[in-house]
Amino acid sequence: MSEERKVALITGITGQDGSYLTEFLISKGYYVHGIIQKIFHHFNTIVKNIYIKIDMLKEKESLTLHYGDLTDASNLHSIVSKVNPTEIYNLGAQSHVKVSFDMSEYTGDVDGLGCLRLLDAIRSCGMEKKVKYYQASTSELYGKVQEIPQSETTPFYPRSPYAVAKQYAYWIVVNYREAYDMYACNGILFNHESPRRGPTFVTRKITRFVAGIACGRDEILYLGNINAKRDWGHARDYVEAMWLMLQQEKPEDFVIATGETHSVREFVEKSFKEIDIIIKWRGEAEKEEGYCEKTGKVYVKIDEKYYRPTEVDLLLGNPNKAKKLLQWQIKTSFGELVKEMVAKDIEYIKNGDKYN
């Protein structure tokens, strides 16, 4: 007798993680259901890309999209009941750290209480013994870091409304796992990027700018704290770790990271190097600027408006537990990530793709 086909429900399917996870799960033979907000009725480029790839796999019938929102409990209950999933991946969030200072209540509602609403939907549908639940947690929980590198046992010290909301979600997952014996786990993912990263995030902001320079634009790139250091990986690698977490005998929380740290400054330099421009620096603090070593032309300046009210200076993850128990490995290096992002952004500009 053949094994019953698995059914996954993904919130945040229009984001970079959601799109890569969708493609990954369908390649594994899953039926995938995704929750999208009404504003995405036109199907943005990421959703289009999912459908294109699925068409190539001749598996378009494996993806169904539903209108919904993490702030609407009755809607979530209805979707969970209708879809009857075996796995739920909660990737939906207001995930921009700086925006969370301006929209703190909304961020808490979506990122914190949204997780609770999904867990309660699972329980109210009587599926707590059937559904495996993945919660997208974040390295921003560590904030003002208490130790280097950060592992599953490192104390949290959140430094933004986004991180505080995610800390609530983290602990409500732990609480429901222990109180109701649910298969629910947190993936504490360190920064992960891709050509599908939103254009307001610093990595994508950099690669889009560099691509523009390569295509003949004449502009200045304004950044905030270029000395901030992050552990950057590729989203395509990280979604496999999400899936692996739900394939274990018992639910556990895992740090997913590369174990390497790089500064925003280094990301800028590597991005420009992809178009044969060597960036040098002069000046200090907000007066610092990056210029082309060969021509002296200034390309990068500092703008204080991009500083966070409370900065997170260094994030460096320890992925040893995931490597040992999940047999998970990084496949894309930092250099390969930057190269892919710049190349794809050049392609986007040349193709006139306004949604990217």
From Swiss-Prot:
Consequence recorded when altering G108D: In strain: HL250; loss of activity
Keyword NADP set for record: yes
GO MF entry, a single one: GDP-mannose 4,6-dehydratase activity
Catalysis performed (reactions): GDP-alpha-D-mannose = GDP-4-dehydro-alpha-D-rhamnose + H2O
Catalytic residues of the enzyme: T138, E140 (nucleophile), Y162 (nucleophile)
Keywords carried by this UniProt record: Lyase, NADP
Pfam families per UniProt: GDP_Man_Dehyd
PANTHER family given in the database record: GDP-MANNOSE 4,6 DEHYDRATASE (PTHR43715:SF1), GDP-MANNOSE 4,6-DEHYDRATASE (PTHR43715)
Protein family membership: Belongs to the NAD(P)-dependent epimerase/dehydratase family. GDP-mannose 4,6-dehydratase subfamily.
HAMAP family (UniProt xref): GDP_Man_dehydratase (MF_00955)
Protein name: GDP-mannose 4,6 dehydratase
Lineage: Eukaryota, Amoebozoa, Evosea, Eumycetozoa, Dictyostelia
